[in-house]
Amino acid sequence: HALTPSTRAVYINSPNNPTGWTLGATDQQAILAHCRRHGIWIVADDAYERLYFEGAGVAAAAPSFLDLAEPDDRIVSTNTFSKTWLMTGWRLGWIVAPPELVPDLGKLIEYNTSCTPVFIQRAGVVAVNEGDAVIAHTADRLRRARDFLQARLQRLPGIEAVAAPGAMYA
């Protein structure tokens, strides 16, 4: 096991970049239980959360530690508008974290991002309020591209192609 007594945090990117691998809810429950017992933080990179192909309906959300979280859990979830809403390069996102981390996270953000331009902030509001159709279209287009590539790779001798359950990588 990679966890040792000195482990302070576990970083999980699911759906994963670049494989599209997705950590299932059962495994998330086991990891969360272990982290609770040992006081280990979970840093969840949820950038591809809504680009998930295995759930019910188009653009279903991937399993998330936030779905399992209790108020006192040590979970930090990061997310971005870049992937889901196709706003790559605009550097707009959000963090879900326990309230006691807010002052330190505020300092980190202040020193790394001096100011997100107002037009990008407004675009983010529109994306959240009106962007479900974009998400559904994007997820469907990516799923079809994955299926297309998967079918062609399976025809090649000696190639075993595993379908990615999420993200934007075939």
Residue ranges of model-derived segments:
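Structural motif of enzymes handling amino- and sulfur-group chemistry
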Residues: 99, 116-138
